[in-house]
Amino acid sequence: MMLQLEQIRRDLHQIPELGFQEFKTQAYLLERINEIATENVEIKKWSTGILVYVHGKSPARKIGFRADIDGLPILEQTNLPYASLHEGRMHACGHDLHMTIALGALEKLIQDPINDDVIFVFQPAEEGPGGAKPMLESEEFQQWKPDMMFALHIAPELPVGTVSSKAGLLFANTSELFIDFEGVGGHAAYPHLTKDMTVAASNFVVQLQQIVSRGLNPLDGSVITIGKMESGYVQNAIAETARLEGTIRSTDADAIDMIKSKLNRLMKGFEISYDCTIKVDYGANYYQVVNDATYVQQFENVINQTQTITYQQADAAMTGEDFGDMLKEIPGFMFWLGVDSSYGLHNARLNPKEEAIDVGVNAVISMITSF
């Protein structure tokens, strides 16, 4: 192979960028793609993403493979010699490996074309605000719309040499949650002259939990998490404002809407009870990832035939993935790729084993060539 995949992964790891800001990443990817492109390859840009069309010899279908390209707002703490050069930004979810694997598979296909057409989708903004849906709806994507699509995600808890998937629900429906409270601040000695938003927000967090525990079918599998709370600025003053940030997750798409409806009603009640103003923003919303059973079975069969990669049955997870928006319209599946890291996803010390890159390339190529 012309491409040095380990070095590419390290280069990409050093330049993590947030959603729809992946300008350096896009330029780097285009440079590598153009190094290996031949006359049977077409390239399109969409926003900060890229679409690469590899024309087959006698196409009966279009196969799509998606790799997400954005990083996270995390300060890296790996102490690696190729750690992030962008302070406060890190590839802490493995998207550097995803891109590298896609490039490796792309080069193999260019060197040894198959009958079918293959579209490689380098998608921005998976971590937020969500790039899959607008990319899916774009003219560029629709012109090359695949007949099936698949993608992978690194799994720190799985050993290198292992892949994992399942038919049906793999990832949950998710929604971001941002709630702002505004009341009246003042001196801590005169609470009766204020509207204390620390108290209001604190009680709101407690009441939120009852939406799931007492308002939804416990078999639905839903959870509301408040991961961040801000209020006040000094110990002897009552907070005029407060902010809650969190997520809503459910294995049932209808349950997400029900939670939001109940939350809106709760919010109106709190505005009356605490004589304040409350505003809510649901941010990015990701549709559940539902794997097509036929393609998952095909993938399992293909992997078992390799004799070098182990297939493992996966469990559904409450994590969110905007690839669900693509699978809502295009049949396909997603699978986990073992990378054997002591630290998990979104951890500042995540350090996937680079041996997983070749495993990922082989798994992707095995699936693409199995049609």
UniProtKB/Swiss-Prot annotation:
Instruction: Please write the reaction equations for the catalytic activity of this protein.
Output: N-acetyl-(2S,6S)-2,6-diaminopimelate + H2O = (2S,6S)-2,6-diaminopimelate + acetate
Name this polypeptide is given: N-acetyldiaminopimelate deacetylase
The family database entries (CDD domains) matched by this protein are listed as: M20_Acy1_YkuR-like (cd05670)
The family assignment reads: Belongs to the peptidase M20A family. N-acetyldiaminopimelate deacetylase subfamily.
Q: Which InterPro entries match?
A: AcetylDAP_deacetylase, Amidohydrolase, Bact_exopeptidase_dim_dom, Peptidase_M20, Peptidase_M20_dimer
The alphabetical list of record keywords is: Amino-acid biosynthesis, Diaminopimelate biosynthesis, Hydrolase, Lysine biosynthesis
Q: What does this protein do?
A: Catalyzes the conversion of N-acetyl-diaminopimelate to diaminopimelate and acetate.
Instruction: List, from the UniProt record, the residues annotated as the active site of this protein.
Output: D68, E127
According to its UniProt entry, the protein's GO biological process terms are: diaminopimelate biosynthetic process; lysine biosynthetic process via diaminopimelate
